[in-house]
């Protein structure tokens, strides 16, 4: 038994009879960036909630849309107000600008480039956000009504303010295109 233990002890510290040298410890090269977020939190395959028989995810309807101003009603960012920048329909999550920031440690791409610590906006469940009126500074549930011209719109129940307008939607889509072009140009 003693011979077996001594042979295992030799295996753990050597490789074919050669001793390993201790690892060199280099000072960490960490750089914090305060610029625009170029990294997005990707959804892992195992994070899907439900699947259809054809293996596609079930898409859920949500009470918020891209470009809506929302207030966080639960979680560690409770009370913060921000604009929705991305919607993930198959798990009912949204990404709100400057809310739910997570720290991401990014490896260097080449040896001479240092690694980075970057803050990214992680998704938050849509049930934890509520539509917010900038004018009256109040959060409200959403209602649906049909206007005189037959168009269905969303409105805030507390204030009666109509959320859906063509200008807001075009503005949100243009901002989304600008950010994707900036990310594509940077990489």
UniProtKB/Swiss-Prot annotation:
Offer one Pfam family short name for this entry. Answer: KOW
Q: Does the keyword DNA-binding apply?
A: no
Localization, per the record, is:
Plastid, Chloroplast
Q: Mind telling me which CDD domains this protein's record contains?
A: KOW_RPL26 (cd06089)
GO MF annotation list: rRNA binding; structural constituent of ribosome
Q: What is its main location?
A: plastid
User: What is the documented function of this protein?
Assistant: One of two assembly initiator proteins, it binds directly to the 5'-end of the 23S rRNA, where it nucleates assembly of the 50S subunit.
Q: Could you describe the subunit structure of this protein?
A: Part of the 50S ribosomal subunit.
Q: Which PANTHER family match?
A: MITOCHONDRIAL RIBOSOMAL PROTEIN L24 (PTHR12903)
What name does UniProt use for this protein? Large ribosomal subunit protein uL24c
What's the encoding gene here? RPL24
């Amino acid at each position: 038994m003693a011979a077996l233990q001594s042979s295992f002890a030799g295996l753990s510290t050597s490789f074919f009879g050669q001793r390993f040298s201790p690892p060199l410890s280099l000072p960490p090269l960490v750089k914090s960036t305060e610029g625009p977020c170029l990294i997005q939190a990707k959804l892992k395959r195992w994070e899907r909630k439900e699947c259809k028989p054809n293996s596609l995810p079930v898409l859920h309807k949500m009470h918020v849309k891209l470009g809506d101003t929302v207030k966080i009603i639960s979680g560690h960012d409770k009370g913060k107000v921000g604009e929705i920048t991305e919607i993930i329909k198959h798990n009912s999550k949204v990404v709100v600008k400057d809310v739910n920031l997570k720290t991401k440690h990014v490896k260097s791409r080449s040896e001479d480039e240092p690694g980075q610590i970057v803050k990214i906006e992680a998704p938050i469940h849509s049930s934890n956000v509520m539509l917010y009126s900038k004018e009256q500074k109040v959060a409200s549930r959403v209602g649906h009504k049909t206007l005189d011209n037959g168009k269905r719109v969303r409105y805030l129940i507390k204030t009666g303010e109509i959320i859906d307008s063509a200008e807001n939607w075009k503005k949100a889509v243009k901002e989304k295109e600008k950010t994707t072009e900036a990310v594509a140009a940077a990489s």
